[in-house]
Each structure stands twice: as C-alpha cells, then as structure tokens.
From Swiss-Prot:
Belongs to the RNA polymerase beta chain family. DNA-dependent RNA polymerase catalyzes the transcription of DNA into RNA using the four ribonucleoside triphosphates as substrates. GO terms for biological process: DNA-templated transcription. This is DNA-directed RNA polymerase subunit beta. It is an enzyme of class 2 (transferase). Signal peptide: none annotated. It comes from Staphylococcus aureus (strain JH9). It catalyses: RNA(n) + a ribonucleoside 5'-triphosphate = RNA(n+1) + diphosphate. It comes from the Bacteria. InterPro entries: DNA-dir_RNA_pol_bsu_external_1, DNA-dir_RNA_pol_su2, DNA-dir_RNAP_su2_dom, DNA-dir_RNAP_su2_hyb_sf, RNA_pol_bsu_bac, RNA_pol_bsu_CS, RNA_pol_bsu_protrusion, RNA_pol_Rpb2_2. Its EC number is 2.7.7.6. One of its GO terms (cellular component) is DNA-directed RNA polymerase complex. The RNAP catalytic core consists of 2 alpha, 1 beta, 1 beta' and 1 omega subunit. When a sigma factor is associated with the core the holoenzyme is formed, which can initiate transcription. Keywords: DNA-directed RNA polymerase, Nucleotidyltransferase, Transcription, Transferase.
Amino acid sequence: MAGQVVQYGRHRKRRNYARISEVLELPNLIEIQTKSYEWFLREGLIEMFRDISPIEDFTGNLSLEFVDYRLGEPKYDLEESKNRDATYAAPLRVKVRLIIKETGEVKEQEVFMGDFPLMTDTGTFVINGAERVIVSQLVRSPSVYFNEKIDKNGRENYDATIIPNRGAWLEYETDAKDVVYVRIDRTRKLPLTVLLRALGFSSDQEIVDLLGDNEYLRNTLEKDGTENTEQALLEIYERLRPGEPPTVENAKSLLYSRFFDPKRYDLASVGRYKTNKKLHLKHRLFNQKLAEPIVNTETGEIVVEEGTVLDRRKIDEIMDVLESNANSEVFELHGSVIDEPVEIQSIKVYVPNDDEGRTTTVIGNAFPDSEVKCITPADIIASMSYFFNLLSGIGYTDDIDHLGNRRLRSVGELLQNQFRIGLSRMERVVRERMSIQDTESITPQQLINIRPVIASIKEFFGSSQLSQFMYQSNPLSDLTHKRRLSALGPGGLTRERAQMEVRDVHYSHYGRMCPIETPEGPNIGLINSLSSYARVNEFGFIETPYRKVDLDTHAITDQIDYLTADEEDSYVVAQANSKLDENGRFMDDEVVCRFRGNNTVMAKEKMDYMDVSPKQVVSAATACIPFLENDDSNRALMGANMQRQAVPLMNPEAPFVGTGMEHVAARDSGAAITAKHRGRVEHVESNEILVRRLVEENGVEHEGELDRYPLAKFKRSNSGTCYNQRPIVAVGDVVEYNEILADGPSMELGEMALGRNVVVGFMTWDGYNYEDAVIMSERLVKDDVYTSIHIEEYESEARDTKLGPEEITRDIPNVSESALKNLDDRGIVYIGAEVKDGDILVGKVTPKGVTELTAEERLLHAIFGEKAREVRDTSLRVPHGAGGIVLDVKVFNREEGDDTLSPGVNQLVRVYIVQKRKIHVGDKMCGRHGNKGVISKIVPEEDMPYLPDGRPIDIMLNPLGVPSRMNIGQVLELHLGMAAKNLGIHVASPVFDGANDDDVWSTIEEAGMARDGKTVLYDGRTGEPFDNRISVGVMYMLKLAHMVDDKLHARSTGPYSLVTQQPLGGKAQFGGQRFGEMEVWALEAYGAAYTLQEILTYKSDDTVGRVKTYEAIVKGENISRPSVPESFRVLMKELQSLGLDVKVMDEQDNEIEMTDVDDDDVVERKVDLQQNDAPETQKEVTD
C-alpha cells in the first residue's frame, strides 16, 4: 500500500501519499490581519500621538501633549452590532496635558476621541452591521532607486529617484551631453552641482575633491552657472517658487522644510533601512579593486591594502570596521541649510574593465541611526556618488517589480496613515483655538475638536478602495479575502496604467505570493494572494521560511530562517524534494536549486538553504487542488478562483481526494468554532457548547472556569447564503487548544466541504454535453445532493414626510382581504408564512397631498366623524423570483429607544425570507481543476447510463473538455476517487508531492478495479452496452453561486427611461431585453414588417400607443395604429438645440404639429382615436 494514514483533526483519517515529511506547521492563516491590528493598538497609536506632540501655539506659550490612551468597553457586542446595523467599536479616550508656560500651570484631562472600530477574532470589522475586510496593499517601498534607460539615440543612460514615505521626491538624470541634472519634487531640472553647493560645498574644487574627478562631473560644473552656496540657494528658490522675490534666508528655510523637517519629510523606518542598505559601503565594495587602503580612522591602522579585490569573505572579515569608521571624513559646512557637520565614508576604487587605470570614489552614508526618519546630506551625497559609480560601471540598477522593493501596507499601517490625516487636521484647529481662547480658563477639552479624526476613520472604513465588503460565500472565500494583496488603491497603481511587467509573475514571488491565484480580467496580476507559509516582517516585506544548511557538514539543520526577497538573492536554495539521507545530507552530488531567479543544477556543497515544503509556492486556495502539478496553470487559476464561489450545500461532504489542506483552511477561516483553551466538553446543544477548562499547575491537572461558545443558527451571510454551525464534539470529550468544536457552513467533520463526491463518466450523450455542458441524474435533485439554502433580507422604513408620518398598518387602501392573509394585526408578515412574488411583507401607507373636499363630503365626514384618508400604498412586497418562507422578522422602534435608527425614521422592519434551492437546468457546476459547465439536462435516473452492477452514474461530462484544456488532474482525481470510494477511505494528495501515476494505478488495483480505470457502461434507455469502455470515477463537483434562479427574468410592462421613454435594461431595474441593430436586420430579412413595427413602437417608446394597446388588450378590441416614437422627438429636439430648424411635413408640405400630450389628454382623446382611425389623426396625437 502506497502512502501512510494521517489524522486530520479529531474525526478524519486520510491516506497521505506525500513523500516529504512536514518540517514546519502552517502558520495561522489570518495572522496577517490580526497581528497587524494588534501592532496598531500596541504601538501604532502611541507612535502617532508621539509624532504630533507637542502642539504649540504661535507664541510658544501654550503646549498640548498627548500622554496616553485607553480603549473602553464596546457599546454593543458583536452579535448586537450586526443586528442593529451598528459599528462594533470601542470608545477611545486619550489623556491630554496642557502646559501654560507663563504660569507653569499644568492641566490634565481625559478626552473622548470617538469610537474606534475593533477587529473581530476572525480578522474582520463590523461596520454599520456588515462584515468588512481591510485588504493589504502592495506598494513601492520608500528607498533610493536606480534605473537603466535607453535614450532616443540608443545610448544607455541612468536615472535615480529618492522616494520617501511622504515628502518631496529627488531625481537625478543625465542628458545627451553627459550633464547630470537634479529635479526637486518634479519641478524643472537643475545641474546636480547646484544642489551640492546649496548643501555647503561651495567651490568647484570642494565638489571635485568630494565626488572624485570624472567627465560627467566636469560637464555638469561647466553647465552650472552658480559659483557659491548663496547663489545656489537663490537658484533653487527661483525654480521651486518662481515669481517670488528670492532671499537667502527664505531659500534656506524652503530647502530645510522640503527635505530636513521631520513633519514634512518622512522616510519611515522601512525607508531608512532600505536607504542604508543601498548606500552603505559594505554593500557596494563587493568584487571591487581598491585604489587606496581601507584605514581604521580612529587608530590609523591599515585594515586592507591598496590593490586588494574584496570578495565576500574579505568583506565579512572587515565588516566591523566598515560599519564603524573606515575611511570616514567629517565636513563642517558653512552657510548651509544644516548646521551640523556631515559624516561620510569614501574609498577610491579602480573602474572595472578600464585599461587606463582610472579610479572612482565610492561614498557611503556612514550609517545614520535607524531613528533618523529624514533624509540627511550624507544620504544625498552617497546617492550622487552611487549615480556616478553606475556611470563608471560599479553598482547595479533596481528591478521595481522585485518583492525586495515592494512592501505590504497591512491593516495597522493603513489605519495609522488614515488616523494621521485626521490628527493633522485636528492639529490645525487646536492651533487656531489656542490663539483665540483665554489662557486662564482654557482646558484641553475646549481646544480639541475630534470631528476631523472621526470623519477620517469613518471615511476609511466606509468608502476606501481597500475596505471591502467581505465575500462570505464559503470558508475558503472568507480566508482568501483576508489574505488578499492588492496593488490598487490610494497611493498604489491604477488598472489602466498598470503595464504587463507589474502584472507578471516574478521570480521573487516564490514562496511569498501565489503565482496561480489572481482574478481573470482587468485586475489580473494586480490582485494576488499570500503564499501558504509566507509572513510579513516589521518593515512590511514578505518573508518565506527556508531550512538552513550547515556550511561545514553540508547537512540540513533544524534551524528555519525567514528570508525576504532581497536577502534570498544572496543564497543558493535547494528544492524541497531534494533527496536526503538519514543524516540530512544531500544524496545527489548535483542538486536542482535556484539562485537569483535562475533554476539550475549546482554542486551540493554550494547549497545555503532548502525549501520547507513543496506547497510553500502556492496560496491556501491553490493548495486545495489535488494533482495541481498535472494541470495547466490557466485552468488551475480558474479552479482556485471558482472554489471561492462554491455555495454551501445543505448536506456537505468532504472530498474523497483531498490535499490535507482542507482541515487547516476550515480551522483558520473563522467559520468554524475552535476551542480557546484545553478543556472537557460539559454540555452540547445545537446553539451552544460549554467547555470546562483544564489547567495544569505543578504537573497536576485541575478544572478551571467554564467557557461558553454560542453557535450561529441559520443566519444570513454577506452573500445571501445560509450561515449555520453544527457541533461535532460530544459531552465528555477532552479538546485541545484550537481544536474544532463546531462545523461552519461548507464543512464536514472539521474539514472544508465545498461540494459533493459524485460518480462521473466522461462520455457524450445525444449531444447534450456539447460545449462543456453537464448532464445530471435526477437522483441528485431528489436526494437533495446539491440543494442549498439561501436567505434574503428585505427592509421597510416608516419615515416622517412633509405631509405627515408614514404608518405601518394592516389597513391598506384598495387591497383585498386575501392579500392580507399573511399579515398580523400590526401589518407585518408572520414568521413561517409561505410568500410568493408580489405578496405583501410589510403593509405601509404614506400620506398623499390633501385635496379640497366638496360640501357633500364635508357633511358626510362631519356626520360619521371619519378623517379623510388620503394615503398611498407603499407596502414592502416580495420581489420577482424571491418567494419563500419567512424565517425571521425584526422590528426596531424609535419609541422603544432604538438609537441606531437613522434620522427621520420612526420604525424599521426587517424580514428574512429563506429559499431552498434544488439544482436546476442552467445552474453552473465545476470541479477543482477549472472544468466548469452549465447543466443542460436533468435525466431520469432510469435513463442514465449504469455500471455493470446496476448503479446509475450521477453526471456525464464531455471528454473533449480535457485534452485541449490540459487539466489532466481531473482524470487522475476521477480514478483515485473511485478507488477511494470502493476502499471506503479518504486520501490526501498534497500539491507537488502527491500521488504519482504508479500510486494511482496501484490503489486502483487494490480496490479491485480494472487496471486502466475504465469500465463498460450500459445505456439506461435501451439496456445495450456502449461501444467502448468509458472512464468512470468519483469526482468532487461544486455548485457555484451563478444560479439560474438569480438570472431568470421576464417583463411585461415596467419602468421606462425618462428622456427616451424606452424600457430600462437589466434584472435589477426590472428592464426589458434590448432589441438591437442586428436583431432588426434579422426581422427585415424575414420581411416581418408588422412584428418589427410593434417592437419599435408599442413595445419601446410610443408613449400613447402603449397605453392604448394595453387598454385594447384588456377590452379585447383591435390594437390601433402606432404614433410617433419618443426617440424621434428627442432627435428633433436635439437638432433644434443645435440651431437647426427641423420640422415634420406631410406630402402636401404642410407642417405636422408634434404636440406634447399629457396623460390626462391621452385618456380624454382615446375615444376620438377609436372613432376616427384615419392616418392624419394618428400623426397629430403623439407623445
């Protein structure tokens, strides 16, 4: 028997065909959300208050500091927030200190700064009652970037950009004459040396001494018209502020505020880290030949002699000296923007491949402290040096699509940025109030206006592109939505501008971003998914784990290192399937490995790391596709995406052929209920589980407190499916931490169960499975195999109107008693009622404008005392195709103190209708390999082809769907599934390390099936065997959310467009079907003139004609001739609006009046129309 039996959770054993043992457990799959939010609450908020403190007034007398903060208790708990359409949030209270410097008085106060949304345990937010997910954003990291470009003459050129987190960009570029220019904040370019002079390097000689002599620098100095620091400052000021009178002081303060003011310019810690990494000497001297010795500046000792070529070992040896003070120089700058001395490290090296022995100076930024978030003069000088080095062939350009240069902004950082915007708006208000208020009586509360902070947070959660309504179709869709990475959004790319290169798979995605799972369509490659083992480090770079190879013994160690993409570039990484002996040494002398994106074979001694698992390349959803290695990537993409659209079934079933990921995905998705502590189950019922904690102290286990786990029963999910949890533990069970206690939707025994295992035959059947269509047995309908439950929510509000309040009532004008049979005495439908399209759910009347009563009516009202009820029926009715059973009714009243109702609403009624949808012709089905199709026919069970033992098969698929699509995985799944069913086992075939051909065929033989996996099938209609043996097996098929019930739509009459008077389009608007240009040609070709005429008039925009037609049909009379369509009159008006005098003339050249006809006129003149049906009359009466 191939494979070994592995336990997945408490209830499921699977035969696992993996050959590689798991060295590292999968991390918690939603920690990308939870960890980031925890960081925000722990550090992010404090960091922001620290950045903004203290706020001082313009005189410097008042100072406001933010000391500390605390979060209070949420007003409503999670369930209550969802029920009341409220936000699950806690009050944020900040301790604020006001210091009045004149008197030395200190006032401390706790200030309420709005309700702050809290993250649920499952990584979501509840905003206005709906669950939302904040998607992580993939953006360019702040750093220094060097780019290679070809100019219009075909010459190789370079440009460079210093990109901060916020602040002005600094760009360097060369022109055709080899002059180097700088652009400050996208303005006009200046010679580079102007900026250097402005920094305090006044003379040409100082600049040459600093950067080293080269022709680019000489050309730039010739172009430079300034001669000293003051002139350079004035030149820069004129470029940045044209039209203002330049002074040296103004120029200094402008340059300071652009680059050196922490409030205006921020590299962020990640920018400082990347800049140091790029510009420091230790990263730039690799493989360079020294033209001067490296000296320890403190001791004067020569560390490395001139002429030495620095390899990696040599650099490691002198690392301490390089990081401290090797060849350091300090410049005292006079008349500069910054008063402090500038420290740099500079070393001359020989230009590579140069016969003349020319040298160039490599200048490093002498490692500014990681706390320095601004750019420093040393950074600017070092970046200029790097640029000149590039022109000499030293250094390398950056690949912007490399994941070392792209980072993630997760929830915490996105929230922090948004909060910062609110705080900076608030800061302005505080400053203004400080100058107005009386200092004696002033308090922090009076100074602070929290509106801008609350507004910016609300705006972020409510309308940001990255705050998305959670796609809650099944546990997998929950999970992948939380692990999604988007390159779109504020500060990111836009769909239209994103080029092929950004969207493409990059070698640095390996183990970090899934190469398979991305949407089809305009967002392809811009929205990605995090790989299964990936994690995000403190700087926002994605790391992936590798097993460390011991450099001495060349054996794999137990140490696991997480590497970012640019760290990985320095190492050789072996594949996870490399063969190892019992000591962890590579068995083959040559090992398949990766180095900087090249897949190659190297000697085993050169290995530095090894992959932890074959599935570390792919995301959680892709890792759920068995035999992924046998599928074409395009189809695997569809398979991964379609699993997310599977509808939760009434009786779900875990797959016979899984990958072992089903249990993990179900546990981490948040749809299941998991134990928060180890304990013993004390009580189980359908809506609650009680677990007594077991606590160990001094080696003795004793009982602790009781944990209560409420279960969700038949709730509506965000996508209108049924969200229901079922216990899978029994009283007395001892459960471990994080063990599954209750299955959620689309789960069975603690495993994800998106579909059902059905017997499938690859065969044609009377052409019904043409074009990927699916033929299904009626058994799947009768036995509720693919039946799903759908819950829809409808609401009705009673508001205050100008004419009086609306009223929810059973007393509705002009409605028969039979139409009110399902309503209670309040006028609201009762729970359990079966309702059909058009039935009333909530009776509601709205006051109409009061009309003047006649004398007789006034008398009657005076006698009988009855108020004139001028009301209109505005009841909530069941929309078309949405009938079902009323599951629940919720009523919210303002009188009963429901403060969550929006202004002007007195009463809100919510009705939930549940539908049980069996599978239909027209529903979409799919497998896990991108093999999708629509059901074309449901065949009676007795007519389906049957196996030799008499069992009819469930589904027939077209065999032509396999070869051209190259998703052979489905065929292997089919055979292995049949074997597993016959053996009564479940199997796991992990991706890239699953069952191979031999395993499949040996399992088939073990199950007593034919070696080729095929069988004779008999035609259910005739009993005759089919000519050839047919592949029959068990495949896992899903029912997708694209159901025919949601798409089926018909209209007789309905709403019309205001201007053209043509019917609207689409099911949502209850619109008609467009009869377009080509359809008109078809009728013209047939000569069906009258059919065409009525389509273009009555059925479209002949406003008078359609009223008359309706009346004629009701009365059973002949339909009169059509009048002028509205669109013709619109065309006339449009031409008239252009100043063209357009008139309609008859044959005698008399003008035909195109009159405007009111609805009342139409009614009055209908009689005339029927009496006098002459063509002239028709032309006159138009609308």
